[in-house]
Amino acid sequence: MDFSPYAGRWVALTENNTVAGVGTTRDETRVAARAARPKERLRLAWVAIYPPYIPLPEWPLAELHNLLPKEGIWLAGGPVRDLLLSRNIHDWDFAVAEQGCALARKVANALRAAYYPLDNERDTGRVVVTDPHTHRPVMLDFAVLRGGTLEEDLRRRDFTINAMALTLKGVLIDPTGGQADLNARLIRMTNPSSFKDDPARLLRAVRQANALHFHLETRTEMALRAQALSITTVTAERIRDELLDMLRTVPAAHGLQALADVGLLSHVLPEIQALQAVKQSAPHYYANSQVHTLAAVSAVEGILVLLKGEARPSSTDTYVPTPNWAWERLAEALLPFQAALLKYLDEPVNAEMPRADLLKWGALFHDVGKTETRTVGNDGRTHFYGHAKSGAYSTETRLEALRFPGKAIAFITTLVAEHMRLATTYKEKLTRRAAYRFYRDAGEAGVAVVLLALADAMAVWGRNLTQPRWRALLRNAAALFRAYFERPTEIVAPPALLNGHDLIALGLEPGPQMGRTLEVLREAQAAGEITTREDAEKFVAATLTGAET
């Protein structure tokens, strides 16, 4: 959008960055905006008087105005790129001539926020503060210039679109042509040694191209392909973080395919690359297991979009050609559980790893076991007996190598190990006993397993998905959601009616049989066969009598 007509004035911006109000002061602008858009959440920005007339957000810049030095400080890197693209900014990077940590500490104290010294050697400090608009934590980083001047600092950065800076008055500094590359939608390295200086940039180039829907500039792509092997010199933690960000972008499947195309996937996720050679027969819509995997990732994204109430996916999706009626039936089935599912998926398994993120990783790895379990029957059809359990082991090994936290590994491997459960039981109406056994095995990952199973079914059947099959799958999925969200103490985790001491009092000898009896008892309770302590005692007595005879 062209903001030049508003140069030197305040504007109120909507979520999609359209102007809802204009004024010479903040208060005047707020009044005008509220009159025009009383129900919308708006953000204020001051439009710079210098080309390209960038709207500078009120928060945090106005908040920091009196705290920051008047000279020797610039907004730099990603935030400048995002301002030029009219994208929301989640983290703010400031380049300063001196005293980065001291300035960060000063800002943290003034905002009553948390301060962290990121890199004492390079004098870089971080402030973590809550954004008043989104109520989410935001990072403000203050880093001393690398090199003697701002221009030298910018030329050392990864890509031209990330090598721009902005004075606090809105003057753009662009020594490498980043604005032109933004307009051309190109990812271009700032200098020929960019990837050699930091091989993690190899992954970042593909990730940012996917996230921004940009293309790799020709020489940059050639250098990336030539140096792909050097990604193996990067620490596992940095590779993990880049891949986490890659999977968070939409569509993630396109980014993963791009990693394969440039020769990076085989080095960072060899199990996924290996699926390229694994062929599968009907009913799979895709004969190639890797393409099927990307379709499953796309289907998970479609489900997440559906739950958020955003644009409904269509049958024209690149990887998931599921009929439109299937998405409509899915939306209807998920609607009663929408709020509960969103809350469940937003909860973190580990710091900054919500279940929604790990669900995508489950989709990515769900079929890696097919590489080792593929067989061909006498009829010429391929089979993958035991691929879920085999895949869980391979997944655990890869995630450990990438230094994933233990809880995240357990969650993702459970998704892989259990992803076939819904598909193998869809022909029969789900019983309370079956629901209990499902959650006993899947634990807190159970709800995510159901969502993955639905995504997998869409990827398996594609346009060939039938209404009776889909109806049955959705029926059992809804039953599992109902058990977890509405009847947890009845079906998922019923409170024990008896304990080990009670069993001893009833005549059971201590030993392994005691644990088995308690589990049988709990399963019967979940099935609704026993509801009281008296029922439980009679059940145990009958069990003991049967054992004696």
Question: PLM features: what roles do these ranges have?
Answer:
Residues 1-17:
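Short aromatic-glycine-(Arg/Gly/Cys) micro-motifs in beta-strand/loop hairpins
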Residues 16-25:
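A short, exposed loop/beta-hairpin motif centered on an aromatic-Gly-Thr core
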Residues 27-40, 45-549:
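Catalytic cores of the polymerase beta-like nucleotidyltransferase superfamily
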